[in-house]
């Protein structure tokens, strides 16, 4: 078999890449290791309205669980900040399939239960994929391979583009979908506590009628395998605000996984290959959110792949335009978020509470967006001189 483009992974990044490439006239094959696309879900399912708009995707009632108008952020001492912002909590099992259907309607083919083993190389150039299907091991040739195969990316590793993750470079995550959760359902809820959730935070994302995704991420360097679920259960019992919200709630689904928080890999392209989504570690290191970036970077990857096929040039020098384009969209955001993530992960509860006392909601919004950071840092220094060392790092 031979295709113009083989996409490994049918998550949002891979599906949008396949959709864009197929829409541009490429012969596209999607290889997906799961039996069912979108199952199990691997995230809290939230995305901003801007994120969908940026990706060129119109909201559809069939995959929107609830609409969001704000975020509520809680400091360790319980102080609450309201940050306005429109968004959605999705039904990812519906959304992910919807994206694949768009790719198929554009002409892409899909093979499920296809476990990618390695990239096929010819003198350093990626020329296809070896995968294990239901009836044995196969090789499929491609002019371009788009690796969207997740955080461990076998394709990216065998192509020499994806290094191993260190514990400090990832967060381990655990989440329940629960029914009977008592929170305001027009808001997403974020709880920061260095003692409960070291190097991370806790979230409640409402899905309507008392349903919600309730979970956390904690820094891998601050935990052992399996700790995330233990910490989640402890928070449900012992954290004052969280335990109150879930007092009558019952879990109906559990999900565990990992999120890279180290910023993107150095090179997301090579001869005959592009990396997208978690495979490229295109995840915001501060929030751990990757859906918005995956959708936009996936579309860029599909478009650049189609341009390369059209120009008959799949060299790294041509495909570099993919990285140039996504860096133009997200480069500054990733750089700031990585710096801010490192700072916040080092702060104690006493320091986090002091920061909360120094800031108002507009300041919090600026910090989250990475806007007017120097102005906010100067305000922190004037109000809480004890936080000077952190504020100075933000100003660099």
From Swiss-Prot:
Give the signal peptide, or none: none
**Where along the chain is FAD bound?**
13, 32, 43-44, 46, 92, 116, 278, 290-291
**Which reactions fall under this protein's catalytic activity?**
a 2,3-bis-O-phytanyl-sn-glycerol 1-phospholipid + 8 A = a 2,3-bis-O-(geranylgeranyl)-sn-glycerol 1-phospholipid + 8 AH2; 2,3-bis-O-(phytanyl)-sn-glycerol 1-phosphate + 8 A = 2,3-bis-O-(geranylgeranyl)-sn-glycerol 1-phosphate + 8 AH2; CDP-2,3-bis-O-(geranylgeranyl)-sn-glycerol + 8 AH2 = CDP-2,3-bis-O-(phytanyl)-sn-glycerol + 8 A; archaetidylserine + 8 AH2 = 2,3-bis-O-phytanyl-sn-glycero-3-phospho-L-serine + 8 A
Q: List the molecular function annotations (GO) for this entry.
A: flavin adenine dinucleotide binding; geranylgeranyl reductase activity; oxidoreductase activity, acting on the CH-CH group of donors, NAD or NADP as acceptor
Keyword Translocase carried by entry: no
SUPFAM superfamilies according to UniProt: FAD/NAD(P)-binding domain
Task: Spell out the HAMAP family in the cross-references.
Answer: DGGGPL_reductase
Q: Which cofactor does it need?
A: FAD
Q: What are the top taxonomic ranks of the organism? A: Archaea, Methanobacteriati, Methanobacteriota, Methanomada group, Methanopyri
Q: What is its EC number?
A: 1.3.-.-
Q: Which InterPro entries match?
A: DGGGPL_reductase (IPR023590), FAD/NAD-bd_sf (IPR036188), Geranylgeranyl_Rdtase_fam (IPR011777), Geranylgeranyl_reductase (IPR050407), GGR_cat (IPR054715)
This molecule's function is given as: Is involved in the reduction of 2,3-digeranylgeranylglycerophospholipids (unsaturated archaeols) into 2,3-diphytanylglycerophospholipids (saturated archaeols) in the biosynthesis of archaeal membrane lipids. Catalyzes the formation of archaetidic acid (2,3-di-O-phytanyl-sn-glyceryl phosphate) from 2,3-di-O-geranylgeranylglyceryl phosphate (DGGGP) via the hydrogenation of each double bond of the isoprenoid chains.
- Report the pathway entry: Membrane lipid metabolism; glycerophospholipid metabolism
Q: Gene3D superfamilies, alphabetically?
A: D-Amino Acid Oxidase, subunit A, domain 2, FAD/NAD(P)-binding domain
User: What does the note under cofactor report?
Assistant: Binds 1 FAD per subunit.
Q: What else is known?
A: Reduction reaction proceeds via syn addition of hydrogen for double bonds.
Q: What's an example GO BP annotation here?
A: membrane lipid biosynthetic process
Q: Which UniProt keywords apply?
A: FAD, Flavoprotein, Lipid biosynthesis, Lipid metabolism, Oxidoreductase, Phospholipid biosynthesis, Phospholipid metabolism
Q: What general EC class does the enzyme of this chain belong to?
A: oxidoreductase
Concerning its family, UniProt says: Belongs to the geranylgeranyl reductase family. DGGGPL reductase subfamily.
Kindly provide the name given to this protein in its UniProt entry: Digeranylgeranylglycerophospholipid reductase 2
